[in-house]
Amino acid sequence: MSEPAPPLESALLVPVPEAEPCVQKHRFRHDSVALLGVPAHITVLYPFMTPDEISDSATAAVERVLEHFPEFPFLLTRLEHFPEGATYLAPEPAAPFVDLTMAIAERFPEYPPYGGAHADVIPHLTVAQTPDAPADELAEIERHLPIRCVAREAWLMVEDDKGRWHTRTRFALARSARA
């Protein structure tokens, strides 16, 4: 008897289209989710509900939380490395992303950030999942820094039964005179 397939996943994220020209080819080589349809992004909450658990009321609850957050500018200023080996671009300021994550996690306490694996929320845009990204590729990314960005929306993305990711719902952040 074969083992059952792992449950499908979902995630809430802030897409960062301004970073795509700089990081896309590197993410395609070193971040497996990039080839599965996940754009350059900063995670708000992962893992979230399985796709079949996402109801209209859950989507409305996410929208009610996010509607209180204004869009905001940020910079991707430097490459950093997690101890586990992933390389990422750090956003400045990081606080608005932490605030988004904490507000969603407070509303959905059964889905802690990163499944509760980490004590702190460290906003990041992953460029490589493994520590073996070549130094010349990282230097190429660094030449484009800082990257000016604006967080305008959050996306609820879901995985399908083939492992590909699709945007299910887009949530606009409130318009802001600052952004």
Q: Where are the regions that the model predicts?
A:
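Basic, often amphipathic N-terminal segments
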Residues: 1-73, 81, 94-153, 167-179
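Flexible glycine/acidic-rich beta-alpha junction loops that bind and position SAM and/or redox cofactors
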Residues: 80-84, 159
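Active-site donor-binding loop signature of nucleotide-sugar glycosyltransferases
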Residues: 91, 159, 173
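Short beta-strand segments and strand-loop junctions that repeat across beta-rich extracellular domains
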Residues: 152-162
